[in-house]
Design a protein with these regions (language model features):
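Active-site-proximal beta-strand elements of phosphoester/diester hydrolases
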Residues: 206-210
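Conserved G/P- and acidic residue-centered "switch" motifs that form tight phosphate/ATP-binding loops
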Residues: 109
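N-terminal beta1-alpha1 cap of cysteine-dependent amidohydrolase-like domains
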Residues: 1-106, 117, 124, 128-161, ...
């Protein structure tokens, strides 16, 4: 059995006078490699997303800039710095396809917000101006400030992590607002900010607001990536078995 192939949604870098670049941070790549997967970049081409996901065993929706609030029917807050429109359309499409087709998906920071918006939910556009809290959620870099999160032990995330409370990094000024229908809150910060979501009807559709890829030596991060890759491995086996069942009688199995 080959290692599972996991696509990472790419960001777009625009510098004046230069050609645009599609990229992902290597911390995502290294985290997936350590967990036993083969990571690949998903280009920001939403018109090809439906065909591309057929080749993947899992999808990682990475962190980045803000989702355009027009997607959930709100005016743009002055602090909102929206991501490249090509990336936004691509990420939202990937989230919808993954949920519809049962493809294992892990959303990180912006990724969990995209999962919520794609399903019809909303975001808090700026925690600092909307929520009375002593927690600095928007510190940069992400490990400059940390806070505790409480995880619901009855959820997929709770079963992955075991501990009901643990400490995470934080680097986000936006957060989950109204939770979309069909999604479930899995973790919260002490101030009530949602720190995790999942679709309980999906084999693995899990998002976290913190950055486990920036916590490589911590057991919680290893557990999250390990569970994600294992779900992708199971999905790959199921695809392989389904393809074998459809093969003509007497046909040689594919390598």
């Amino acid at each position: 059995m080959h290692k599972p192939l996991i696509g990472i949604g790419s960001d777009v870098l625009q510098n004046e006078g230069e050609r645009d670049r599609a990229f992902v941070f290597t911390t995502y790549i290294e985290s997936l490699k350590r967990a036993g997967a083969v990571p690949v970049l998903i280009p920001p081409q939403p018109e090809n997303a439906a065909d591309l996901v057929e080749t993947l065993d899992g999808i990682l929706l990475a962190g980045g800039d803000d989702c355009d609030p027009a997607e959930y029917g709100e005016e743009k807050h002055p602090t909102c710095e929206t991501m490249d429109p090509r990336r936004q359309k691509n990420d939202l499409g990937l989230a919808k396809l993954a949920r519809e087709r049962g493809i294992p998906t892990l959303g990180i920071c912006l990724g969990v917000q995209v999962m919520n918006v794609a399903a019809g939910g909303t975001l808090i556009q700026d925690i600092g101006s909307a929520v009375d809290t002593d927690i600095d959620h928007a510190s940069e870099p992400s490990d400059r400030h940390r806070h505790d999160v409480h995880v619901d032990s009855s959820t997929t995330l709770g079963r992955i992590l075991g501990d009901q409370e643990f400490n995470v990094n934080s680097s986000h000024h936006q957060a989950i607002g109204r939770v979309a229908d069909g999604l479930r809150v899995t973790a919260k910060a002490p101030d009530g900010i949602v720190e995790g979501l999942e679709d309980p009807s999906h084999p693995f559709y899990v998002g976290v607001q913190w950055h486990p890829e920036d916590m490589p030596g911590e057991s919680s991060a290893s557990a999250i990536f390990g569970a994600f890759v294992e779900a992708a491995r199971k999905y790959a086996r199921e695809k392989q078995n389904a393809a074998a069942d459809l093969s003509p009688v007497g046909a040689a199995p594919s390598e």
